């Protein structure tokens, strides 16, 4: 999908403030702590690395620390929010955000750990089907993970990874170019492993089209949704995505 630009777009401070005033989510700004620079709230554009702290975060942490202090190990099964049941309570919430069924999601571990676990299950290279398509400039942790998993199978990342780059003079990938590369790799392609949103350019990929193209050549499609979950509409179940983490 493409966004229609404002017909009267202006590169001016007054126009930016006008759009901010009309933003239905503008009030959410007041719910976060901002670092101060020269006594003023910083203009914060590092959410892709570490988001701003919600003002409610400290109270939630204090609540659980108090439960730990007063109940110790009994906190797993007793109290207002027993820790053991947290994962079950989170399932329907996560499922709604991801467009998945509750039985298809679980809250566990850390992003890179989950990527490794998913690769162990879904990356099963053969002598003829072993290639992995990834967007060029992927998040560094994802690159390290892929190289580690490829070497685990005794393969050379230079022989396995197919990095997608924008056309000359462009900054984002065209969906038709991604699909074309998938079809080009064909029976040698084992997996498409991409982000949902490219952390550096902010490009939202067409997950459905990419997944469909991968399946058409017999490959699996998985996505790192660290920057997409809760940030863009997702319908992972309907799109038939093989695996994802965030």
Located regions from the model:
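Pyridoxal 5′-phosphate
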Residues: 2-246
């Amino acid at each position: 999908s493409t966004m229609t630009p404002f017909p009267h777009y202006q590169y001016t401070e007054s126009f930016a403030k006008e759009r901010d005033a009309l933003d239905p989510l503008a009030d959410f700004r007041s719910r976060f702590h901002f670092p101060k620079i020269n006594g003023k709230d910083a203009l914060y554009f590092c959410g892709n690395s570490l988001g701003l702290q919600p003002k409610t975060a400290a109270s939630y942490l204090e609540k659980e620390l108090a439960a730990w202090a007063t109940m110790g190990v009994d906190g797993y099964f007793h109290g207002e929010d027993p820790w053991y049941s947290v994962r079950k309570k989170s399932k329907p919430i996560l499922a709604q955000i991801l467009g998945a069924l509750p039985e298809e999601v679980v809250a566990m571990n850390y992003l890179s750990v989950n990527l490794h676990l998913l690769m162990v299950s879904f990356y099963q290279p053969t002598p003829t089907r072993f290639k992995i398509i990834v967007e060029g400039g992927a998040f560094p942790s994802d690159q390290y993970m892929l190289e580690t998993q490829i070497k685990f199978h005794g393969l050379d990342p230079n022989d396995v990874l197919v990095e997608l780059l924008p056309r000359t003079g462009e900054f984002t990938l065209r969906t038709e170019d991604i699909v074309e590369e998938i079809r080009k790799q064909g029976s040698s392609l084992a997996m498409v492993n991409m982000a949902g949103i490219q952390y550096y350019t902010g490009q939202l990929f067409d997950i459905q089209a990419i997944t469909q193209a991968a399946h058409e050549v017999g490959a699996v499609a998985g996505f790192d949704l660290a920057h997409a979950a809760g940030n863009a509409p997702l319908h992972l179940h309907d799109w038939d995505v093989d695996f994802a983490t965030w």
